[in-house]
Curated annotation (Swiss-Prot):
Keywords: Cytoplasm, Keratinization. This is Cornifelin. Part of the insoluble cornified cell envelope (CE) of stratified squamous epithelia. Pfam families: PLAC8. Its main location: cytoplasm.
Amino acid sequence: MSYPVTSQPQSASTCYQTQLSDWHTGLTDCCNDMPVCLCGTFAPLCLACRISDDFGECCCTPYLPGGLHSLRTGMRERYRIQGSIGKDWAALTFCLPCALCQMARELKIRE
């Protein structure tokens, strides 16, 4: 015996609001951590490889085209930091040492 369907199933929608935060330190706060500042200034690729490794990615990621950009964007996504891909691109293109230092400081604070 079959029964006719008298009502359609309703879709359940759950809306989660996520609170976005800011970077713990500013882009130009390089001197807050002098060892990171010196490494970012004189050996930025070494710092980039360390950041990548500390973030759980392959240490060769910074050498790939767009690798640093995806790393910074991934960091923003994981830690729910406000920003955009365009701002990530601008920071890494026009102020690479400062952006790397900011990323390294953020990892130190969050980990």
